[in-house]
């Protein structure tokens, strides 16, 4: 420190500074003690009620860096203020964001104490002498130097590319570089350090941090200062020290500035040195006083904890009652103030906020996609797995690459220009704080994106090299979808915080003279034992916040409904928790974690080329639900099958809903409701269950010989494949099969008898049959009178061209009944009028298990995307009747016949030939 400054800050001034600091801490203590008790009570309440943060997030949260991680190290020129000379120093910046200066690299490596250590909280980075001179003159209120011009710069530069670090109440830092690239890298990293040091403390969720910030707010309100404060940066010692310096500064300027002698640069240097010495004195005393104050508060809350926990219900009830009383007094003037001074401007402020903020997040997305594409192209050219892993490690460092991230941050720096009117209308000059918070969120989201990408891709790096580029592309698309949702969530949070931060001071100041004086009379509603945990000022502020929050959420929700800047609505069918399960990349064989739609698409001959089989990494079980243009896959659940008698099966193709089947054959409907109540059926397959009739004791054997399902559709004749034998079925066989079917109506007596026998069999828990019909195609031929139509909601209407693959419902945890497997063969028979009767013969087998994966080929633009988590069909609402039903009359006593008429029109009807065994699960690699 220079001699001039040392001579001015004598012992008398030091004593004065200590006295003012002690008085400030004493005045601040009651505010901090009150807020400490309130925050501790809220903390205990949250712990007791087990409150959770319901903020939804898709991307995995990147773990914090290990302490001591080096972000930057290089040798450069630094101006040594003590000797006023430029020296070559070895600069190291770790993830505590302190700038450490060492004599040399060897000194750093052997663990020497740094020559200087700078925490640049509240600082500003400049790269030109002109910018620095303007800023430093602004904070040097010297009346005698108003007309004086500097003949030389404040610091002579040894190199062409300087970096100036301006700091409030501290001496400034000066660095110099040979090349512009080095200057850009260092200045960008310094900006990162400043952003984190400014806001990382305020992001803490500890009740002590919340208590301190609330205490600072109430302390400043008592002096007539509302809203944010540009000095609320750094940790609690730095913030409180700046609060004291704010009171000291006028006195120091009056007493010391006139005594400074010399040229302007000399006086300026002396003034900055004087401020630094005063600030160090204040900071030391504040640190001691704040630690003592914390110990007192901790002792107080330790005594209160028992009361808080035992009286929690009473405390909550008392606070709610007090809130109602104060709200009745505040609501009318607060709403009037909002309606006149805030609400008319919220939409325009939001519009100005959305542009730069959304542009910044879009730039982050584009940067991530660009880096991943370069990684993929590099591997495609070299096929070098080692180089790919190295590139992946570099990708993980992308959020810390200040040079690459700087163009993203620059997009948001346009915000102060867009919000110039706020300074006059709402007196909000601190838009820079909003910019810095937004930039921190952008960096955090990039960290989550690259971390999620690395987690999802890592399992595939050991696989075949030819599949890695496809895996990279799939994982990239998956992460980008997650990024879009998380970006929308974070941006809405930024908008909400900014709108309240900008407009709340206006409401607070408007009501301060009318409502605040009335608060004292409401203290009578607080029990004496609870006066430490409930304060009327806090309740009053919460009410104002909630009123304003409602107004801000209205305009944000409206913007989301209008899809402005790709904002998503809050009521979308998305998970409320982070998709952390994506680390479980391996799906066990037979597991139901994988989407049924994905398993179907893995064996679809007509599936799109880009739909490669995969595990959970490529599935979108939740996001698909939010896409209105993607129809859900249809699934059919056969609940029961009558053994003789009239049976009616209805198939519902209502728009946007699942395909349900309901048997309405008299007493058998009770059996249907049983299965529906039980959820999904065993092995995710449609099951045909038939009770054992008493008319023929050997009915099970008879059913093994023949169990027929008849599907009546309007179509032209098509060639079907025998699923069991894997060979086409000639027309002669179709006619023979038709001869086995008796379309005549059965007698009512037989129905009644079968119903009685069915109840007897259920009571004995007889083992029914299970018919698993693979490859049964419910797509139909086009009708001459109908045309393809598809509902805008993404579901399929009654005349949809193709219902898409009929999807297997998920396996029930507790199947209602155990069933025997069966082998099913399908046949078509032409009928008059252009109808084709599609029959399915189900032959029970002991060891055969068949899957039901009907396939419907469609045009590429008509392929219905399968949703990830499908509802169990037929088990939700037994009243969902099919839209097209037809009676099935059968005189055969032991045949189970379904007649399903589907009037959906398609170009062709095709049944693909599959193995009898269950569909092969995707490999662990895919």
Curated annotation (Swiss-Prot):
Compositional bias of type Basic and acidic residues: which residue ranges? 733-745, 756-767
Q: Where is the lipid attached (N-myristoyl glycine)?
A: 2
**Which InterPro entries does the UniProt entry name for this protein?**
Niban-like
Q: GO CC annotations? A: cytoplasm; cytosol; plasma membrane
How does the entry describe its membrane topology? Lipid-anchor
Per the record's keyword annotation, is Lipoprotein included, yes or no?
A: yes
Highest taxon above the source species: Eukaryota
Q: Where is the composition biased (Polar residues)?
A: 661-672, 840-854
State the similarity comment.
Belongs to the Niban family.
The job of this chain, per UniProt, is described as: Regulates phosphorylation of a number of proteins involved in translation regulation including EIF2A, EIF4EBP1 and RPS6KB1. May be involved in the endoplasmic reticulum stress response.
Protein name in UniProt? Protein Niban 1
Native organism is Mus musculus
């Amino acid at each position: 420190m220079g001699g001039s400054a040392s001579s001015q800050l004598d012992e008398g001034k030091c004593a004065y500074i200590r006295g003012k600091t002690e008085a400030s801490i004493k005045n601040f203590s009651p505010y901090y003690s009150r807020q400490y008790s309130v925050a501790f009570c809220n903390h205990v309440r949250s712990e007791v009620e087990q409150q959770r943060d319901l903020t939804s997030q898709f991307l995995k949260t990147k773990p914090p860096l290990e302490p001591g991680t080096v972000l930057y190290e290089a040798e450069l020129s630094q101006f040594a203020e003590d000797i006023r000379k430029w020296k070559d120093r070895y600069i190291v910046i770790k993830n505590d964001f302190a700038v450490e200066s060492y004599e040399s690299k060897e000194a750093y490596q052997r663990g020497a104490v740094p020559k200087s250590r700078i925490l640049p909280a509240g600082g500003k980075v400049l790269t030109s002498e002109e910018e620095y001179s303007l800023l430093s003159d602004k904070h040097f209120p010297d009346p005698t130097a108003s007309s004086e011009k500097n003949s030389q710069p404040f610091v002579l530069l040894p190199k062409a590319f300087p970096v100036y670090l301006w700091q409030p109440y501290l001496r400034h830092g000066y660095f110099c570089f040979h090349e512009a690239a080095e200057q850009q890298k260092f200045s960008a990293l310094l900006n990162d350090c400043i952003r984190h040091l400014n806001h990382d403390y305020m992001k803490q969720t500890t009740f002590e941090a919340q208590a301190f910030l609330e205490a600072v707010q109430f302390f400043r309100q008592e002096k007539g200062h509302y809203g944010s404060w540009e000095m609320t940066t750094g940790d609690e010692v730095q913030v409180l020290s700046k609060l004291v310096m704010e009171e000291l500064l006028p006195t120091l300027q009056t007493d010391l500035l006139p005594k400074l002698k010399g040229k302007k640069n000399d006086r300026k240097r002396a003034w900055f040195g004087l401020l630094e010495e005063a600030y160090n004195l204040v900071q030391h005393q504040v640190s001691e006083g704040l630690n003592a104050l914390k110990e007192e508060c901790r002792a107080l809350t330790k005594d209160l904890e028992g009361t808080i926990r035992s009286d929690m219900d009473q405390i909550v009830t008392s606070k709610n009652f007090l809130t109602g009383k104060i709200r009745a007094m505040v609501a009318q003037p607060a709403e009037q103030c909002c309606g006149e001074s805030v609400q008319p401007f919220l939409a325009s402020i939001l519009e100005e906020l959305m542009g730069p903020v959304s542009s910044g997040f879009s730039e982050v997305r584009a940067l991530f996609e660009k880096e991943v594409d370069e990684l993929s192209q590099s591997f495609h050219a070299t096929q070098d797995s080692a180089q790919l892993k190295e590139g992946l490690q570099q990708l993980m460092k992308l959020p810390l690459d200040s040079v690459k991230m700087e163009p993203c941050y620059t997009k948001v720096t346009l915000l102060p220009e867009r919000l110039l009117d706020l300074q006059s209308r709402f007196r909000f000059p601190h838009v820079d704080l909003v910019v810095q918070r937004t930039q921190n969120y952008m960096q955090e989201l990039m960290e989550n994106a690259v971390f999620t990408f690395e987690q999802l891709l890592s399992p595939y790096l050991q696989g075949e090299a030819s599949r890695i580029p496809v895996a990279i592309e799939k994982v990239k698309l998956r992460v980008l979808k997650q990024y879009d949702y998380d970006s929308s969530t974070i941006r809405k949070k930024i908008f909400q915080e900014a709108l309240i931060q900008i407009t709340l001071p206006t409401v607070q100041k408007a009501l301060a003279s009318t409502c605040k004086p009335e608060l004292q009379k409401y203290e009578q509603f607080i029990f004496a034992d609870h006066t430490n945990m409930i304060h009327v000022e806090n309740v009053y502020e919460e009410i104002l916040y909630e009123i304003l929050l409602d107004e801000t959420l209205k305009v944000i929700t409206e913007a989301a409904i209008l899809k402005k800047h790709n904002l998503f609505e809050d009521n979308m069918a998305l998970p409320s928790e982070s998709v952390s399960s994506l680390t479980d990349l391996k799906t066990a064989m037979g597991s139901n974690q994988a989407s049924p739609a994905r398993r179907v698409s893995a064996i679809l001959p007509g599936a799109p080329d880009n739909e490669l089989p995969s595990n959970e990494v490529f599935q979108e079980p939740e996001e698909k639900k939010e896409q209105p243009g993607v129809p859900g896959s249809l699934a059919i659940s056969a609940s029961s099958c009558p053994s003789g008698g009239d049976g009616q099966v209805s198939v519902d193709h209502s728009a946007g809903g699942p395909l349900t089947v309901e048997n309405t054959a008299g007493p058998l409907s009770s059996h249907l409701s049983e299965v529906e109540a039980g959820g999904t059926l065993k092995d995710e397959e449609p099951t045909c269950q038939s009770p054992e009739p008493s008319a023929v004791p050997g009915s099970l054997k008879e059913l093994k010989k023949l169990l027929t399902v008849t599907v009546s559709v309007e179509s032209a004749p098509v060639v079907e494949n025998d699923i069991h034998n894997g060979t086409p079925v000639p027309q002669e066989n179709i006619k023979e099969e038709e001869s086995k079917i008796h379309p005549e109506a059965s007698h009512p007596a037989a129905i009644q008898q079968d119903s009685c026998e069915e109840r007897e069999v259920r009571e004995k828990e007889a083992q029914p049959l299970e018919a698993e019909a693979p490859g049964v195609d419910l797509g139909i031929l086009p009708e001459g009178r109908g045309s393809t139509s598809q509902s805008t909601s993404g579901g399929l209407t009654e005349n949809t061209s193709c219902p898409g693959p009929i999807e297997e419902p998920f396996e029930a945890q507790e199947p209602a009944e155990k069933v025997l497997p069966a082998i099913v063969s399908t046949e078509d028979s032409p009928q008059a009028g252009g109808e084709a009767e599609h029959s399915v013969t189900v032959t029970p087998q002991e060891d055969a298990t068949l899957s039901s994966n009907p396939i419907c080929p469609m045009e590429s633009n008509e392929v219905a995307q399968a949703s990830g988590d499908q509802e169990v069909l037929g088990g939700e609402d037994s009243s969902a009747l099919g839209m097209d039903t037809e009676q099935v009359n059968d005189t055969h006593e032991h045949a189970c016949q379904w007649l399903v008429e589907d009037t959906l029109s398609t170009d062709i009807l095709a049944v693909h030939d599959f193995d009898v065994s269950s569909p092969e699960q995707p490999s662990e690699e895919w």
